[in-house]
Swiss-Prot record:
Organism expressing this protein natively: Syntrophobacter fumaroxidans (strain DSM 10017 / MPOB)
Cellular component, GO annotation: cytoplasm
Top-level taxon in the UniProt lineage: Bacteria
Name of this chain's protein: Peptide chain release factor 1
Pfam families documented for this protein: PCRF, RF-1
Post-translational modification: Methylated by PrmC. Methylation increases the termination efficiency of RF1.
Function: Peptide chain release factor 1 directs the termination of translation in response to the peptide chain termination codons UAG and UAA.
Database matches in PANTHER family: LD18447P (PTHR43804:SF7)
Alphabetical UniProt keywords: Cytoplasm, Methylation, Protein biosynthesis
N5-methylglutamine PTM sites in chain numbering: 233
Length: 355
């Protein structure tokens, strides 16, 4: 680990030299690339500097303890040494997490897909709740959310919503949300006060660039039709809705939120590209898992990952046995209280696999 840290520190010094070169300012694209790389490894270099400083203090205190004869002073040095060892261990664990393998998709934007599962109208209402939660979380992180497609129900719910989430670190944070989200609450239509359980599925796909996934236009079938609202009624007098079918994979994407056929097609292709990239990466992960004879990655996406219990104001994430009695705050967008421990957990898992 320490060889890697020395290498990172050396690279950091080289990047600082590059950034101080006035000629680099003439090439803004290269300057931004180097500045971004410099900012990414700066926390590692800072933590490594702290680690080395603590080690020097530990050696100094150990030498002073050997030389000291006064019992009270010796006890003070022992306490100082114990505290320094604790700080060194914490800093070393933090450095291990920082050096854990990084997901190559972490810097990408996101295609977020939320769909109602079991539970009928109640599940559709919870799709609306979850989308509102993610939208508020995005606002707190200054990300941009753009609805690509949605299908409303008659009482304000959503059968499905697909949105693009653009912003720094969007995939690195939201990737932990994919899976089945279960809700337990008394529906508005329930006269007996009984708690119902419904389920919603969340898919989080890294947005694919054209260089990531090439789509041959000959592999596409594009159909246009009139967009429809709740209940199936037509909401447009022109054929602006677009259905794109990728013939080799059988994937189908429908977009009808825009009044322009051209814009709907562009959005549909964005979603299709993300789904194809996700499919390719899932197949690759499955091959690796078969080779290792164990599941690799963040686990089966179809499993229940979280339960939202409204009567108890409780949210439980089953992957890390985390329970918080602040459901109202979480639904208000305070998702970092769940995502931070999830991120730490999966980083530690990735590091263990590397070792």
């Amino acid at each position: 680990m320490f060889d890697r840290l020395e290498s990172v520190a050396q690279k950091f010094r080289k990047l600082e030299e590059d950034l101080s070169n006035p000629e680099l300012l003439a090439n803004q694209k290269e300057y931004q690339k180097i500045a971004r790389e410099h900012a990414e490894i700066a926390p590692i270099v800072e933590a490594y500097g702290l680690y080395k400083g603590l080690h020097r203090q530990l050696l100094d205190n150990q030498q002073l303890l050997e030389q000291e004869t006064d019992p009270e002073m010796r006890e003070l040095f022992r306490q100082e040494i114990a505290e320094l060892k604790r700080q060194i261990e914490d800093t070393e664990n933090g450095l291990k997490l920082m050096l854990a393998p990084r997901d190559p998709n972490d810097d990408k934007n996101v295609i977020l897909e939320i769909r109602a599962g079991t539970g009928g109208e109640e599940a559709a209402l919870f799709v609306s709740d979850l989308f509102r939660m993610y939208t508020r979380y995005a606002e707190l992180r200054r990300w941009k959310v753009e609805i690509l497609d949605s299908h409303q129900t008659g009482i304000g719910g959503l059968k499905e919503v697909i949105a693009a989430v653009n912003g720094q670190g969007a995939y690195s944070r939201l990737k932990f949300e994919r899976g089945v989200h279960r809700v337990q609450r008394v529906p508005v239509t329930e006269s007996q006060g009984r708690i119902h359980t419904s389920a919603v599925t969340v898919a989080v796909l890294p947005e694919a660039e054209e260089v990531d996934v090439y789509i041959d236009p000959n592999d596409l079938r594009v159909d246009v039709f009139r967009s429809s609202g709740p209940g199936g009624q037509s909401v447009n007098t022109t054929d602006s809705a677009v259905r794109v079918t990728h013939i080799p994979s059988g994937l189908v994407v429908i977009c009808q939120d825009e009044k322009s056929q051209h814009k709907n097609k562009a959005k549909a292709l964005k979603v299709l590209r993300a789904r194809l990239l996700d499919q390719m990466q899932s197949e690759q992960e499955a091959r690796i898992a078969r080779d290792r004879k164990s599941q690799v990655g963040t686990g089966d996406r179809s499993e229940r990952i979280r339960t939202y219990n409204f009567p108890q104001n409780r949210v439980s994430d089953h992957r890390i046995n985390l329970t918080l009695y602040k459901l109202d705050i979480i639904l208000g967008g305070a998702l970092d209280e769940i995502i931070d421990p999830l991120s730490t957990h999966f980083q530690a898992e990735a590091l263990r696999r590397e070792e």
